[in-house]
Amino acid sequence: MGSHSVEFSVLVLFLVSFLLGSTSAEKLCSDNDGDNGCFRSRVLAAQRADRVKELPGQPPVKFRQYAGYVTVNETHGRALFYWFFEATQNPSKKPVLLWLNGGPGCSSIGFGAAEELGPFFPQNSSQPKLKLNPYSWNKAANLLFLESPVGVGFSYTNTSRDIKQLGDTVTARDSYNFLVNWFKRFPQYKSHDFYIAGESYAGHYVPQLSELIYKENKIASKKDFINLKGLMIGNALLDDETDQKGMIEYAWDHAVISDALYEKVNKNCDFKQKLVTKECNDALDEYFDVYKILDMYSLYAPKCVPTSTNSSTSHSVAGNRPLPAFRSILRPRLISHNEGWRRMAAGYDPCASEYTEKYMNRKDVQEALHANVTNISYPWTHCSDTVSFWSDAPASMLPTLRTLVSAGLRVWVFSGDTDGRIPVTATRYSLKKLGLKIVQDWTPWYTKLQVGGWTVEYDGLMFVTVRGAGHQVPTFKPREALQLIHHFLGNKKLPTFPF
C-alpha cells in the first residue's frame, strides 16, 4: 500500500473511530489485521490519548486540538511537550506550521499559544476563562507549538545531567527527533507542506532546525522525510555584532538613552569582539538600567505595575531581572505577578502573562492537556529558571540563512518596529551584512486602508516591518500578523496599495 493510501486510510479510520467512540485499539488491532491494520490501530490509540476534549473555561469550537508528550531520547527519558490545533477550516488541505519561542528557556505554549497567535487566551478571572482569539493562526494552518528544550514548561528529562548539556545543537536535534516522531503519531499530516516560524532567540532555533531537516532529508528514509517548504522569523537574534550595534543605536535614536551614554557605549564596546572589557560591561549595565522603568520589548506599551495594596514583586518581573549584556542569551519579557494592570486603547494587557501562569498551573488544566505527568517540583513558568546554562550559541546565524536561501526554501524575516531588544535597526544591519541582492527596495504594504509596514524583497528572502508592533508582533498587531502569515504560506507579496 502506498504512503498516501495509508495516510488516507488512517484519516478515515480516525474519523470513524470518533463516531464509534467505544471501539478499543485492542479490538481494532487483531491477529488478522496484519502490520498495516495494527499500525492504524496504534496511531488511532495514540491520537485518541492526546485528544484535548475541552479545557476549563474554553468557549465552544469546531476544530480539534491535541496535546501531550513525544519522546526524543528513550535512553535518557527525554520528552517534549506539544500542543496542536487543527486548522479552523479544511485541515486536510492546510499546511502544518510549527511555532517556536526563544529565550533560550522560554515556552512557546506560554507566549506563542496563550498570548500571541493561538486560539485561546487566558483571562483575568476568579474562575478559569479562555477568550477566543479572532486572529488565531490556525485560521491559516494546522498549528503546532513545542516546549523546547527539556526543562522548559512541561518538557522533561529523567537524566538530570541533560540540563547541563543544553545548547543550540541539542535543542535542534531534539526538536528534529520530536518532529520525526510526531509525524509518526499524526501520519495524516506527513505529506502536507511544513513550515517553521518563531521569534527572538528562535532566530537561532528556526534556522538551525530548518538546516538540520534539510540535511537529514538528503539521507532520511521515506518514513522520516519532513516536507519542509520554508521558515519565517520575527525580531530575531541573528548576528551578535549587528544585533548589539542596532540595539544601542535604536535606543539613542528613540530618546531612551542620553548622548553621553550612547557615546560611552560606543567608545568602550567593540561588538565585533567576543571578549567584553570591564569598561564595556559597565557602560552596558548603565544602558540596561534604563529599561528597568520601560518595557524594552515594546517601547511605548505600559508595564504591568503593582497596586498600592500589593507592592510585592515577582522574580519574573522584567524590570527586576538582570539583563545579560552580551552574546544576547536573553529571555523574552516576563510580566509581573501583581494584581495591578493597565490597558492600552487597543486592548493590549501588559499583565497577560500573569493570567497565563495562573491558568497553566491549575491541576484541571494540566489534566485536560495531559501535561505534567512527572509532577515537576516547580511551578510552570513562561521562562525556566532550570535552563541556566547554555553550551553553544553561534555568534552569527547569517551563514545558516545563506545555506537555506541557496537551498531554495522560502525565507521571510519580519520585525515589529517598537521593539527595543532586537529592534528593526538591528535586523536591517543584519540583512545588509547577509549580502543578498535587493530585488525591490523599501515598499509600503497595507492592511485595508492603513500602512501595515514596509517590505524589502531580496533575492531569496523577504523582509517585512510591522508598524507599531513590539517584540511579540502577533500580540500587538494581531490583524497584521494574521495577514502576514497568510501571505507567507501562500507565497504571495503583501498588498502595496490600500484595499
Curated annotation (Swiss-Prot):
Glycan attachment sites: N73, N124, N158, N310, N372, N375
EC number: 3.4.16.-
Tissue expression remark: Ubiquitous.
Enzyme class: hydrolase
Location(s) in or outside the cell: Secreted
One Pfam family recorded for the sequence: Peptidase_S10
Disulfide bonds, paired cysteine numbers: C106-C383, C269-C280, C304-C351
A GO BP annotation: proteolysis
Active site: S200, D419, H471
GO cellular component terms attached to this protein's record: extracellular region; plant-type vacuole
Task performed by this protein: Probable carboxypeptidase.
Family from the record: Belongs to the peptidase S10 family.
Name of the protein: Serine carboxypeptidase-like 34
Species for this entry: Arabidopsis thaliana
Lineage per the UniProt record: Eukaryota, Viridiplantae, Streptophyta, Embryophyta, Tracheophyta
